Amino acid sequence: MTSPTDRVPSVPEPAGQQAGAPDDLDRLRRRTVVVLAAAQVLGGLAAGSVVTVGSLLAVRLSGTEAWAGSVTTASTLGAALAALGLARLAVARGRRRALSTGLALAAAGAVAVVAAAVLPSFPLLLVGGVLMGVGGAVNLQSRFAATDLSTSATRSRDLSLVVWTSTVGAVVGPNLVHLDASAMRLTGLPELASVFVFAALGLLAALVVVQVGLRPDPLDVAGRRDGTTGERRHVPLRVALATLRRHPRSAGAVLGMLAAHAVMVAVMSMTPVHMQGHGAGVNLVGLTVSLHLAAMFAFSPLVGLVADAAGPLRVLVAGMVLVVLAAAVCGVAGGDHVLVTVGLGLLGLGWSAATVAGSAIVAGDVPGPERVAIQGLSDAAMSLAGAGGGAMAGVVLALVGYAGLNAVSAAVAVLAAVVVLVVSRRAERVLPAT
């Protein structure tokens, strides 16, 4: 039975019959963005913990540094596997059910990591990493959920505000390790395990925020507004791919996001190795990575405003140009740590522009259930692109060095930018610009 808080507010059918309805929808849009942003802050603690603390725990439980990246890899795999499933669940049952399910699985993953540290069990740690990766898929879907009730005038801004709140998790999550000693004394848990207790609590708090705050469900309201409420159905992967082929602007946007994400992960993951090889200390490496993360997320609202004003396609291409410029700066930096830091900052800003603008194009280009399916496909592909970029980066670094890695990365970004421009211009001959 549907509870009163779940009922979807009716959207005016003939224009002008319900003068207050547009204002009601706008208030609901703003509230939805705030709820998603709050959940992103709480759930983001887990993502920040996986990258830093997960690698330390992996070394401790496996007994070798060779498995240091295993938890991050497992988390990335979990995000990729979950993205399509959560998108299908959103189409069938709404955003609230999809996001809540993902957060519950991620919280279970954090508990599994704690159990792995207590037992100890390295295989259980990897299982926990996969489940925590579902939280990454929730973060990705949340940015699209923020656009369910948006218009073309606010779509990029709404999306970017949710992306921006990821900054909190990226910064605070790794630093929870400083509370570990105190938590060990209070709980008796093994070293590093308490960080994932905090992560589990954050994920559960995010689940409560989503359950309480996303009422009515924004996807239900959007379906009522757009006249697609009765079209909820499972969209197979082949149908999503066929839909993407019929919408070249979205296809180009997805390609741009994949290229920017793969290059970002490849260059970022190998930069600490390069810097330490040129004498940089751990503190300097940490500062450089922190500035890069700040550039990725902190400027997202500004990027969203520019995309709404100038058009997301222009901002997407500008982001690709910044990625190329960043690779060029890093490639010629050598042992100049200042240049490397500048390059990583440009890389983060380029990633932000490409991701925010590309996501806005995907969110506004395809109607009905196919839109959510393509969003899930995009999220899964981004996770796989990041995993592929990180995996190949080490091989390329060993073969041609840091400068060569950046040259290859720049070439990938240039090729992707050209394809984005070509397919988008072809689309504009048939369809109006996004």
PLM-predicted stretches and their roles:
Residues P9-R30, R215-L255:
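Juxtamembrane intracellular "pre-TM" segments in multi-pass secondary transporters
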Residues V41, F122-A137, L339-A353:
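Hydrophobic core of transmembrane alpha-helices in multi-pass small-molecule transporters
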Residues A104-L119, L322-G335:
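C-terminal ends and interior cores of transmembrane alpha-helices
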Residues G128-T165:
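Cytoplasmic helix-loop-helix junction between adjacent transmembrane helices
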Residues F299, A310-G358:
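C-terminal transmembrane helical hairpin of 12-TM major facilitator-type secondary transporters
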